[in-house]
Amino acid sequence: MEQIDDLQEQLVNFITTQVCIVDNNTFVLVANWYPKDKPETYEGAEKYPAKVISININTKTVGWTLYETGLLKSYTDGGYIDGKKIVLSSDLNANFCVFNYENGANGSEAPETHFAVRNIRLIGQHFYAVSSRRNIYRRNSKHNWEMISPIPHQLANPNNIATHAIDGFSESDMYMCGDSGDLWHYNGDIWKQLDPPCNWRMTFLICANNGMVYVGGEQDQLLAGKNGNWDEVITQELAFNKGYTAYDMTFFKDTLYIATGFSVYSLKENSWVSVDEISSRSTLECIDSNSDIMIIGGRDKITIFDGKKEEILYSDNSDLNKAKVVTSSIASIADDIRDAGDELLDTIQLMKPKK
């Protein structure tokens, strides 16, 4: 596959932080400003522009919209609602950007209730956003977000409040996960807290088309379940523990994949195995798929994988690769510190005496 000139141009001084497949011809990237002449200033990237870029690989055309501020941490998903193509992106502070493909980007969208975003997923006909303290929001329409979180008496353990991911087979069969083995199921009416056989930090969640629910951890731990039966496939003791961090996870053609930052791994016989067909280059941090194709994004590479071979959509072979790895690690550490601070504030809030 030849590289798209417009995409190369749009990514000058930008790095990819999120990828999304809308359909077989439409991919979306979130890209953060990265000044090649002054890479050391990347640590202040939240002050600078970011882009949501839509790519049509059939027509080789590129559309984009610009955020006024950067997206040091971004979340994106897209697909079709009522037959119309749509993409939603957000940063940690619920600064949403909607791309609806009829008139380009709708610009910023602010919900009536402010909340911190940890994950976005299009399930059925609605976007869902995960916030801290087990707060789940459903987007009913533009600017209209409805909270559908568990009510207080449903909380078997109210202290495990950091929530990280959501996914679902349908809008009446959804799961969410968070810290210390905090795992929940939603039947369209109420949330039920589950009791998995582990208590590590759950950061990724996939409801796969084989009927399985996969829950992953940052150190490559893995929990798998179906019909209420859960198996800790890869325990904390058996995880990599080699300095790798899992950044993203997807299920593609009957196989589970994770992006660790330096390589892509697939699950085979209850072990993570490097996918040699996907060449590593610096960082590979974001991954998404549908039934036909998988897209992997990194700081200097975007590639499409069909299960057998990769085709590079974008590549940057600049001398800044090593610097990007370092700043990526710094950004990841900063995100962890920010999350820990949010959790501490949540805990303090819960401890305050009621008036």
What positions do the PLM features span?
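Solenoidal tandem-repeat scaffolds enriched in leucines and small polar residues
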Residues: 136-225
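Repeated scaffold domains used in trafficking and secretory/extracellular systems
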Residues: 13-20, 68-83, 113-125, 159-165, ...
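Conserved beta-propeller blade signature
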Residues: 28, 85-88, 127-129, 174-175, ...
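Short loop/turn segments that connect beta-strands within beta-propeller blades
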Residues: 58, 100-104, 140-143, 186-190, ...
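Surface loop/turn motifs at the tips and blade-to-blade linkers of beta-strand repeat domains
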Residues: 8-11, 65-71, 109-113, 150-158, ...
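Beta-strand-rich domains and repeat architectures in extracellular enzymes and scaffolds
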Residues: 5-48, 69-77
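Loop/turn residues immediately N-terminal
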Residues: 33-36, 50-51, 91-96, 133-136, ...
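Surface-exposed loop and turn segments in beta-propeller and other repeat-based domains
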Residues: 148-159, 236-240, 317-351
